[in-house]
């Protein structure tokens, strides 16, 4: 089952913005490897087209939601995570 038609331009733009933010976190040398690993999984999740946009954004919010509580994460990365969550919260079915 393909959800290709449900990916509006607004949703695709939001996903691209989130991917840019995640790539920025991955290229930051002060970010621990476990957080970079989760960021990579989130990028892969956002690239899938076999689920609805709301399901994909919910999956990503769940994955990175736990990262904000990680004591090893730098403050600027925590702010980026909150920004990503606020972008993805707008996507609904």
Which role does the model predict for each range below?
Residues 1-31:
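Short terminal alpha-helical segments
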Residues 8, 29, 50, 70-71:
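Short, charged/polar micro-motifs that form catalytic or ligand-binding hotspots
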Residues 11, 51-54, 93:
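Flexible loop/turn segments at the boundaries of HEAT repeats in alpha-solenoid HEAT proteins
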Residues 11-14, 56, 77, 84:
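Amphipathic alpha-helix face/heptad-repeat signature
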Residues 16, 44-47, 82, 86-89:
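Generic structural signal for well-ordered, non-transmembrane alpha-helical segments
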Residues 17, 59, 80:
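Charged catalytic carboxylate motif
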Residues 66-93:
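Amphipathic alpha-helical binding modules
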């Amino acid at each position: 089952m393909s959800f290709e038609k449900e990916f509006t331009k607004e949703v695709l733009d939001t996903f691209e913005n989130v991917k840019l933010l995640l790539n920025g976190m991955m290229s930051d040398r002060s970010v621990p490897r476990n957080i970079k690993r989760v960021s990579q999984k989130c990028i892969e999740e956002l690239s899938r087209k076999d689920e609805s946009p709301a399901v994909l954004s919910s999956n990503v919010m769940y994955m990175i939601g736990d990262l904000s509580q990680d004591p090893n994460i730098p403050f600027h990365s925590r702010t980026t995570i909150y920004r990503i969550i606020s972008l993805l919260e707008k996507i609904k079915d």
